Amino acid sequence: WIMGHMVNAIAQIDEFVNLGANSIETDVSFDSSANPEYTYHGVPCDCGRTCTKWEHFNEFLKGLRKATTPGDSKYHEKLVLVVFDLKTGSLYDNQASDAGKKLAKSLLQNYWNNGNNGGRAYIVLSIPNLAHYKLITGFKEALTSEGHPELMDKVGYDFSGNDDIGDVANAYKKAGVTGHVWQSDGITNCLLRGLDRVRKAVANRDSSNGYINKVYYWTVDKRQSTRDALDAGVDGIMTNYPDVIADVLNESAYKAKFRIASYDDNPWETFKN
């Protein structure tokens, strides 16, 4: 999965997919009542990027729905996964469940079209704080009470705080999560970060009793760091330059071993060689 980083304006969906992304990451900010409000990152952000592009969250979802609904004039067949980077740092811990419920209702109405031929992309809820695990239970409760528990089949999870892998496993246990787990590791492109924790996550993914299904690394903009991440065995790379990742995947060393994921590749299934 080539994951376009910080895609917060509707116009950027086309831009990143046309550069080779089959997945995008979108920032979600919340108001003081735990309603998802804007797709917005703000300053500071990655080096070389404009930090302030934004849409109202529900408007972004409508644009995203068009981009992922077969038959729509804006449809991109290859856009198959969306990571919502949930900026819950502005919330109190006891608002996490409400944030999950409100997020689910927004998605149900504006992205999934109330279960009636909505957008088809898989969705990852990426949460920066392990203490906010109730966002997951709230999300699930809302979809169930709205009569669409089947949409949970399209939803996965990530805790993005680079926490100890044992602590992450524990948070999932508390949230009742037993699958659909993506594990991120990374740092802003302005700084360097080694691959030690990525290798631990990959080892967990590949062990018989691990909780992780997929591992992705962020934010990778250079060819050599792309090669290093692929050599470590990641499933996804988040980038500001999807064309760079696509170029490396075309190199002879990687062409035989990796391919770009399509809609038929289940993102919740651990890949077995």
From Swiss-Prot:
Keyword Disulfide bond carried by entry: yes
EC number: 4.6.1.-
Catalytic machinery residues: 5, 41
Species, as recorded: Loxosceles apachea (Apache recluse spider)
InterPro entries in UniProt: PLC-like_Pdiesterase_TIM-brl (IPR017946)
Function per UniProt: Dermonecrotic toxins cleave the phosphodiester linkage between the phosphate and headgroup of certain phospholipids (sphingolipid and lysolipid substrates), forming an alcohol (often choline) and a cyclic phosphate. This toxin acts on sphingomyelin (SM). It may also act on ceramide phosphoethanolamine (CPE), lysophosphatidylcholine (LPC) and lysophosphatidylethanolamine (LPE), but not on lysophosphatidylserine (LPS), and lysophosphatidylglycerol (LPG). It acts by transphosphatidylation, releasing exclusively cyclic phosphate products as second products.
Keywords noted in UniProt: Cytolysis, Dermonecrotic toxin, Disulfide bond, Glycoprotein, Hemolysis, Lipid degradation, Lipid metabolism, Lyase, Magnesium, Metal-binding, Secreted, Toxin
Locations listed in the record: Secreted
Protein name as annotated: Dermonecrotic toxin LapSicTox-alphaIB1c
GO molecular function: lyase activity; metal ion binding; phosphoric diester hydrolase activity; toxin activity
Disulfide links within the chain: 45-51, 47-190
Catalytic function, reaction form: an N-(acyl)-sphingosylphosphocholine = an N-(acyl)-sphingosyl-1,3-cyclic phosphate + choline; an N-(acyl)-sphingosylphosphoethanolamine = an N-(acyl)-sphingosyl-1,3-cyclic phosphate + ethanolamine; a 1-acyl-sn-glycero-3-phosphocholine = a 1-acyl-sn-glycero-2,3-cyclic phosphate + choline; a 1-acyl-sn-glycero-3-phosphoethanolamine = a 1-acyl-sn-glycero-2,3-cyclic phosphate + ethanolamine
Cofactor: Mg(2+)
